[in-house]
Swiss-Prot record:
Disulfide bonds: none
Reactions mediated catalytically: a triacylglycerol + H2O = a diacylglycerol + a fatty acid + H(+)
Protein name per the record: Lipase
Gene responsible for this protein: lip
Propeptide: 36-302
Entry annotation: catalytic residues: S418, D609, H648
Gene3D superfamilies: alpha/beta hydrolase
Record's compositionally biased regions (Polar residues): 45-54, 144-175, 184-211, 274-289
Length: 688
């Protein structure tokens, strides 16, 4: 509704002292009148907002209530019926009627009424503080009779419709009474001159103090109202749960009710002025609590993650890799070392990522099965046929699952470092084609079979990325990995850390390399010594050899719907004899293997990163590859340029002594990798 222009006529008011109020209203600003009009429209909803104003107005109102409480009592009783018919004529008449009816309830004695009436008449006519006194009166009436306002307004509207003739009669009476009372005011003014001198100074100070407080409260109220106008729906919903009767919650329904008045600055300021002058009945901290609560809830909403990648990134560690909760104390954090936490940094920069926790020394097959259950959740089932073939237990640990809804159409990015690159290739092969041996075994022997071994689960992997992965094996494992001394070392380590009091988990419990609760240490050592693991090909030591890698290459294939990419490093230099020698900044434990690989008979295998030859890390020999460009491709290995002076652990930041490879460089590398994965989703998302 549009705000109506307020018009005043001396002929429209009743007899008695009501004319005194009319004279006072003429001194009041248009803003207060408009505020009263909107207050009438808003009803009890808007009146409730006055309860959140400060303690200062309450004290000032109590000081002045004894002087302004019962103004115009006698005349109000005589003219209340006529004034009701004028309720909807002008906003000023509405305020007058309400003041007349409200004051009727507070009439204590006729003598007090007469005295206060005389005092107030003189003050309204001659004092410069009349507007402030009238505002205080409005404050009191608004707080005491806000519940009866609507019912009286409805009654007055009905009277206007049914008795239009009362308007003319009342107008005539008001004109006569106005003339009579103007003369009466002159005679009464002399009686109150002395009283004014005694009280005028105090009233002036009180009014000035009231004005300053009202300005401050008004500004606070306008700020709260303006804030809720911008977020009216959201703020209302938040406050409705825990703050049922506060300023923020009241402002929004009112705004919805009268949208045009929100855009009217004059009306808005008038309403704020009325609220600021209302009697405060609660602690003024309530408004501050509402604001603080809204701010906290907004911040909580802003913290909700919107990841850049649609498909989660799964980081898969390599041989002798651990997560922090199960690693030996001598080892550093796998993904980032002392430089940074790669997964956490990706998360903080908008990429959803997880660190897989699988066997440190297990075979690619066993690790792939564990990786499936790490993502999907559930108890690891290595398969009945596989367990019978290699002589270990069928079931392993139970995973909670980081992506329980993982299924065809719900894809993931697999990123593997070192042996982890082989493991993720094995997993993707099982998803698509399953394990025919397990299917046949189940047909013959019955029982359950894992969905992983049944195959037919294509369209679950978006990309496969490998970092320093020995796709074709490594001379390090050929020459050292299967030597008796190396196996003995692995046996001793497993024996030491496999006791029941150790938190270290090598992921070989299904092989028996974990002390049982009721088993003595001597019994445990004998069992570990007799384990078939040390002679089995179902282990990481075998799969890292060139023969083991070749076997994996024959069993796996490229998926035409997956983006493949490899990253390779080297940290050796050529000698005069044509060999490759480890660089000075190579990770110290790898200098032995780096120099050993650098002396290989095959010249093309000599350049290496300390553990893996460059030629083995680029792509499987039997699978198609291209040089990587800015444009991603599916179904082919995309080989990125070799990173010089990068050894095997520089991709994961484990060498804290290498000053050439900085934290910023590592962070930049991973941000670029993650961004490339997001771009690859444009190619693979069409298959969802």
């Amino acid at each position: 509704m549009k705000t109506r222009q307020n018009k005043y006529s001396i002929r429209k008011f009743s007899v008695g002292a009501s004319s005194i109020l009319i004279a006072a209203l003429l001194f009041m600003g248009g803003g207060s009148a408009q505020a009263a009009e909107q207050q009438q429209d808003k009803g009890t909803v808007e009146n409730s907002t006055t309860q959140s104003i400060g303690d200062e107005n309450e004290k000032l109102s109590e000081q002045q209530s004894t002087q302004n409480k019962n103004v115009n009592e006698k005349s109000n009783v005589d003219s209340i019926t006529e004034n009701e018919s004028l309720h909807n004529e002008t906003p000023k008449n509405e305020d007058l009627i309400q003041q007349q009816k409200d004051s009727q309830n507070d009439n204590k004695s006729e003598s007090v009424v007469e005295q206060n009436k005389e005092n107030e008449a003189f003050v309204k006519k001659h004092s410069e503080e009349k507007p402030q006194q009238e505002q205080v009166e409005l404050e009191k009436h608004a707080s005491e009779n806000n519940q009866t306002l609507h019912s009286k307004a409805a009654q007055s509207n009905e009277d206007v419709k049914t008795k239009p003739s009362q308007l003319d009669n009342t107008t005539a009476q008001q004109e006569d009474s106005q003339k009579e009372n103007l003369s009466k005011q002159d005679t009464q003014s002399s009686k109150t001159t002395d009283l004014l001198r005694a009280t005028g100074q105090n009233q002036s100070k009180d009014s000035q103090s009231t004005e300053e407080v009202n300005k401050e409260v008004k500004n606070d109220t306008q700020q709260v109202t303006a804030k809720n106008d911008d977020d009216k729906v959201e703020t209302f919903n938040l406050n409705s749960k825990e703050e049922p009767l506060k300023v923020d919650k009241q402002a929004n329904p009112t705004t919805d009710k009268d949208k045009s008045s929100k855009n009217d600055k004059g009306s808005h300021d008038g309403l704020a002025n009325l609220e600021s002058n209302a009697v405060a009945t609660t602690n003024k901290q309530s408004k501050q609590q509402v604001s603080e609560k809204n701010e906290d809830q907004t911040n909580k909403s802003a913290k909700q993650k919107q990841y850049k990648n649609n498909d989660p990134i799964i980081l898969v560690h390599g041989f002798n890799g651990f997560t922090d909760d199960i690693n030996p104390s001598v080892l550093t954090h796998y993904w980032g070392g002392d430089k940074m936490n790669i997964r956490q940094d990706l998360e903080e920069n908008g990429y959803e990522a997880y660190e897989a926790s699988i066997s440190a020394f297990g075979s690619n097959y066993d690790r792939a099965v564990e990786l499936y259950y790490y993502i999907k959740g559930g108890r690891v089932d290595y398969g009945a046929a596989h367990a019978a073939k290699y002589g270990h237990e069928r079931y392993g640990k139970t995973y909670e699952g980081v992506y329980k809804d993982w299924k065809p159409g719900q894809k993931i990015h697999l990123v593997g470092h070192s042996m982890g690159g082989q493991t993720i290739r094995q997993l993707e092969e099982l998803l698509r084609h399953g394990n025919p041996e397990e299917v046949e075994y189940q047909k013959q022997h019955g029982g359950e079979i894992s969905p992983l071994f049944q195959g037919g689960h294509d369209n679950m992997v978006s990309s496969i990325t490998t970092l320093g992965t020995p796709h074709n094996g490594t001379h390090a494992s050929d020459l050292l990995g299967n030597e008796a001394i190396v196996r003995q070392l692995a046996y001793d380590v497993g024996k030491m850390y496999g006791n029941k009091d150790s938190r270290v988990d090598f992921g070989l419990e299904h092989w028996g390399l974990k002390q049982k609760p009721n088993e003595s240490y001597i019994q445990y050592v004998k069992r570990v010594q007799n384990s078939k693991l040390w002679k089995s090909k179902d282990s990481g030591l075998h799969d890292l050899t060139r023969d083991g890698a070749t076997d994996l290459n024959r069993k796996t294939s490229l998926n035409p719907n997956i983006v493949y990419k490899t990253y390779t490093g080297e940290s050796t230099h050529k000698t005069l004899a044509g060999k490759q020698k480890a660089d000075l900044n190579m990770f110290l434990p790898f200098t032995i293997t780096g120099n050993l690989i650098g002396k290989a008979k095959e010249k093309e295998w000599r350049e290496n990163d300390g553990l893996v030859s460059v030629i083995s890390s680029q792509h499987p020999f039997n699978q198609k590859y291209v040089e990587a460009t800015d444009k991603n491709q599916k179904g082919v290995w995309q080989v990125t340029p070799t990173k010089h002076d990068w050894d095997h652990v520089d991709f994961v930041g484990q060498d804290s002594t290498d000053t050439k490879r900085t934290r910023d460089e590592l962070q930049q590398f991973w941000h670029g990798l993650a961004d490339d994965l997001v771009q690859s989703e444009q190619l693979t998302s069409t298959n969802k």
